[in-house]
Structure formats: structure tokens, C-alpha cells
Amino acid sequence: MSAFIVLGSQWGDEGKGKMTDYLAKDVDVVVRFQGGNNAGHTVRVGDKEYKLHIIPSGILYKDKVNVIGNGVVLDPEALFQEIDYLEKAGVDIQPDNLMISDRAQLIMPYHKVLDGIKERSRGKKDIGTTGKGIGPCYTDKMERSGIRVCDLINQDVFKENLKENLKIKNDIITKVYGEEALDFDSICDQYIEYRKKLAPYVKDISVEVYNSIKNDKKVLFEGAQGTLLDIDYGTYPYVTSSSTIAGGVCIGAGIGPTLITGAIGVAKAYTTRVGKGPFPTELFDDTGDWIRKSGREYGVTTGRARRCGWLDLVILKTSSRVSGLTNFAITKIDTLGGLEKVKVCTGYKFNGKIIDYVPASLQDLAKCEPVYEEFDGWDKDIENAKTYDELPENAKIYLNKIEEFTNTKISIVSVGPGRDQTINLNNM
């Protein structure tokens, strides 16, 4: 595949960072196309662990070009903190291996303030935002009042846009919520400093990515979050503010759909979720606790404990359908090792019928009862398996069920967090 997508097929945290890192060795360009620093990707290389939030996972290879697309919302403060963190870890970052779209929207201090204020005002109806200003920034983008990277590069344009925006935002902050106004000069000075550091990285990434594909370079598009967090197909309103499915690539990276040759959906061998919202296969017993501890299920960005449950094949089937997945990469199958029995959800019982899709209505999804198929478990120690044949027979039966139900072949199986703990079935 010359231009392919790696995206999450559940509620995020599926292991996209590891999969992108693993696949990046064979590509030339890695592109982030949506989201912001609310994403959290963990990549382990040898005995080192890297936690990435905004920079594409390909940055850990010396010879890859990494691109932050126009569909991303960019917090310059978070970006430069991440660059500093990576450089201290020995990762070289220069304008020849990191590009930033001139059309990307900038997260401003008032976005983060409003994100926190609005979430607190919701009380018990909060939606679990990370408080990083992602939603308010996307709101400004759709209202056509946002400030883009290209606006920051033009200092006069930036000052004028900031002046207009801050007047409106301060009115909301002070008059609606009774909070303290933000200062124009301090924000302006801060972002003018960011401008100097950002400028060398800024390019028209649509042109760059298009030319890469046309020149037979291999391009990997790295998704953030997951299908069930998509603004349209997720469990709305407990979703993110961008399009996390394959269609988001065209908008967020500025290329046409005919240039994309494949889409790999990353999914855990079980299901997790952070924050509120329906979760049909959630486990509230000792098994759920065991999976959480065994899988180290705590958020990279928030540190919040993840809710855990059995694998939901209805969700994976939905993910495959809405993104046109060509392959699955299954992660953390080692976490289930040692359980005597494992289950997968093959349908929902809803209003006396069995359905195999995710309802749009939260109220309907909350009423859905999972229909399970039970399988025998497998040996705990599979972390050293190097080939598919070395996996326990019961694990293979489990994987075969995923392929059969979703009508999507599995191409990669992860048996641990390391690069070398990855089994490639060589069928992509």
C-alpha cells in the first residue's frame, strides 16, 4: 500500500502509536490529519518509552518526514514542550523532518479557559473533555473566526484577528461566567515568540503530501482517538470534535480519496473507554479489574483509569463499514492470556430483536444488551511469540472469529508493547 491510513476502531487508546511506529519503518512520510494534543500515543523502542501527543509517531525514525495536517488544531505551547521533551530524549527534530500546515487552526489561551469553564458549568452532565481547548478551537473554525498558522506568520493579520476574537471571548468569560478577562498584550507577545519558532516548519502540506504520493513515496496517515469518538459516527455527545474515520483524511490532509490505497483499523483484543457514555460490554466485576491492571489501562493524556469490557465485534464491524477498512491490527491479545474463558459480543438485544449495528441514539444504545459468544482462553505467556503459528490455538480461534464477523482480514497481531513484539501476517 502506497498511501494508507492507520486509525482507531474503538473508543481510542487502541495502540495506534505502536502500530504507526511499527509500520513507519517502511514508509517515507507520516501525517497527522485531525485532533490535537488531546491524543496520547505511547511508543516503546527497546527499553525507552516515548509519549507523544501532537507530533506524528514517525518522528522516532531519523529518515522520515512527519507532517501535522490542516485538520489538526495546534497548541504552540504544547508543541514546543513536546519537541523539547523529544530532543532531551535524543530525538532530532528539524524543518526537514517535521512540517506543519499553514492552514492548521491555532489553539489560543481563551479556548482552554472556555473549555474548562463550560465543562464545569455542565455539572453532572459534563462530557469528559480533556480541557485542552480542542472543542472551542474547532468551534471557531466552523464559525469562521479561528486563527490559523498562516495568520500568525503575518504579524499584522494576527494582531487584528486576536484583537477581534479576544473582545468577544472576554465578554463571554466575564459577563456570562464571571471569570477574569484575558490580557491582549501578554497573549500577543507570547504568540509572536511562537511565530519565530514555528515559521521554519510551516508549509502547504497538501502540496507536499500530494507530491510525495505522485513521486512514489509511501505515506502513512496517522489517526487520533477512534471511530466511536468520531463527531458524526461516535457516541455523541461523548465524542471528540473532529472526524476520526477514514474520510477525515481527505479533509485533514488535503488529498483526494482516490489516492488512498488502504485503511488499517487498530483494535484491542478487548474494549476500553475513558469518560462517560454507554459501553455495552463493560465489566464491573473482578475480570474487568484484572484486565485494567494487566493491560495497564490508564490514559496517556489524562491518567484516568479506563473502563474495561469484553471485545465488541458490533463496534469493529461498524468501524470497518464506515472507514472501508482493508485490514485490522489487533493489539494487547497478550493481556487476555491466563483467563479461563473469554467472550466477544456478536450482537445487541434491543426492543426484542438482535441488531448488529451501533444505534445513533445514546438512549437506545444504553438499552442494548450484549449477546456473547464464549471461547476457551489461552496460556498467559505469549509475549515472545514471533509468528502466527506460535500463538496458542485458542488465540487463533479468537482471531478467526474477528475476521469472520467483520469480514475484514487481520494483518498484524501485537503481543506486547515493544516493536519486536509484533507479528506481521504479511497479507496487506
Swiss-Prot record:
InterPro entries for the chain: Adenylosuccin_syn_GTP-bd (IPR018220), Adenylosuccin_syn_Lys_AS (IPR033128), Adenylosuccinate_synth_dom1 (IPR042109), Adenylosuccinate_synth_dom2 (IPR042110), Adenylosuccinate_synth_dom3 (IPR042111), Adenylosuccinate_synthetase (IPR001114), P-loop_NTPase (IPR027417)
Pfam families found in the cross-reference section: Adenylsucc_synt
Cofactor: Mg(2+)
GO biological process: 'de novo' AMP biosynthetic process; IMP metabolic process
Stated family: Belongs to the adenylosuccinate synthetase family.
Function statement: Plays an important role in the de novo pathway of purine nucleotide biosynthesis. Catalyzes the first committed step in the biosynthesis of AMP from IMP.
Organism: Clostridium kluyveri (strain ATCC 8527 / DSM 555 / NBRC 12016 / NCIMB 10680 / K1)
Gene from which the chain derives: purA
Class of enzymatic activity (EC top level): ligase
Protein name: Adenylosuccinate synthetase
Tree of life domain: Bacteria
Lineage start: Bacteria, Bacillati, Bacillota, Clostridia, Eubacteriales
Keywords: Cytoplasm, GTP-binding, Ligase, Magnesium, Metal-binding, Nucleotide-binding, Purine biosynthesis
